[in-house]
Amino acid sequence: MALLREGHRCIVGIDEVGRGAWAGPVVAGAVAVPPEIYANPLVLSDADDSKRVPARRRQALADEILSVTSTAIGWVDAWLMDALGASEATHLAMRTAVTALASTTRDGAIDGPGWHARRASGVARSAEILLIDGYPIGNPPAPQRAIVRGDRECLAIACASLVAKVARDTFMTALAHPFPDYGFDRNVGYGTRDHFGALIAHGLTPLHRRRFQPMRHLDQCSSAHAPALPSPTRTAPTGRGQLGFLDGWDTL
């Protein structure tokens, strides 16, 4: 890899999941892949853009990524997305993930109003350069290079895409229990015909992004809302791999 030949030793890939969803947080993964992994074609050989990896394979791949890399997850809640807008909220999730990756506390935990980040695996790593899928982010915490289709072309970005996808899907699927009418275990917060029907029938939840359509229109037309979101548990569910800790996210 050219960046390794240039002398960079901590190359961090970043990608987001959930920017275009109707409900739930936007989530960013930040992954520092050790140089020796690039030299071994047998390790992480199936890592790819999370949209191209079958759902049944994502959890196993995410667990493999966590076992050999330093990884952090950052997320921004729906209400803060409404306040900041999708682009700035996504950039904030990415920046906090990189900051948590470098934090020397036990789990790299950092939090603010409506945003949170944790290190999910590995030791603290301070990025020398950031590789980002698509477009540059504002106020990056390290020098950055944006790569078009980076989640398909760059191992570190593909890894970030996968862990962010698994983390967010795990979280949204767990919310199908307190909010059974919205099909979060199937749509993970994205827009579908059934999801729209649930919004018409039951109103908006605190997870829904009121600045986004069609929620903005529905919010203006009706004052009916679903009950408040229950306090999240701090117990990781069984059978969800190493990303089960994300069930403890504070979502409001």
Indicate residue ranges for each PLM-predicted region.
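RNase H-like, Mg2+-dependent phosphodiesterase core
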Residues: 1-252
